[in-house]
Amino acid sequence: MEKAIEVKGLRKSFNDAEVLKGVDFEVKRGEIFALLGSNGAGKTTIVRILTTLLKQDGGTAFVNGFDVSSKPEHVRQSISLTGQFAAVDEILTGRENLIMIAKLRYLNNPRQVADSLLKSFGLTDAADRRASTYSGGMRRRLDIALSLVGNPPIIFLDEPTTGLDPEARIEVWKIVKELTNNGTTIFLTTQYLEEAEQLADQIAILNVGRIIAGGTLEELKKLFPPAKAEYVEKQPTLEEIFLAIVGKKGRK
C-alpha cells in the first residue's frame, strides 16, 4: 500500500535539549496511525514538523509524497491539522465557521459545503447557534468538521480529546473511525492508551525522543506472553505493554 507519510532519522533540538533523536516510521494511506507517548515525549514536535510549522534539524519527512522541507506549500495543500484545543471562532455560528473556512479555501458553494458537513457531524440543529454555546463534544466535532473542508487526504489530530469528558471522547472516536471509510489518512497523537487501542490500525510508542516499539495492537501484544490466571489466558492490555516497554527502556 502506498505511503501517506514517511519519516527517517528525524532529529530536533531546542537549545541543548534533544527532543527527537532519530525517529523513523511510516504511515500507509487510509489507515489510522497513533503516536503514543507521555507528556514531553516529542509527539507535538513531530506533528509540527510534519505540518511544516517547524523545521527539523536532521532526517527527512515526506507527507503525501512531498518533502516537508523543500515542498512545504504542497504539504500544506494536502493536510489539515486539529490541535489539542479547538480552533473554532466562538463568536460565529457553526455554519458561519464552516463557510468562512470554505471561502478561505476558495471552494465553490461554501454554504453547501457547510451544510453537508453539519449534517455529517450531527450539528444541523445547532448550525445557527454561536459556537460559544456548544458543549465540549460539539465544539470538537465542529473543529474536526472544519479540518475536513476541502477533503484533505491526510488529517493530523494532535491529542483531539484532551479535556473532553468520557461521553464526548467516545463521540470523537466514532467520527475518527468514520473518516477512514472515505480513504482519509489519520495521524493521531494521544497519551490516552484506550484511545490508541480503540482507534489505531498501527501504533508507535514514542519515549524520550525515540520510537521504542511499533506495530498493530496484536503485534505489540505478541511482545509479551499472556498471563495465566485460574487456567484462563489473560492477554496483556496496551497499558501493560506501554508501561513495560517504557519501563525497560528507562532502566537501560
Regions found by a protein language model. Name each.
Residues 59-70, 74-75:
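Conserved ABC transporter NBD signature motif
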Residues 80, 99, 103-126:
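Conserved ABC ATPase "signature" region
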Residues 155-159:
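Catalytic Walker B motif of ABC-type/P-loop ATPase nucleotide-binding domains
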Residues 214-215:
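ABC ATPase "signature
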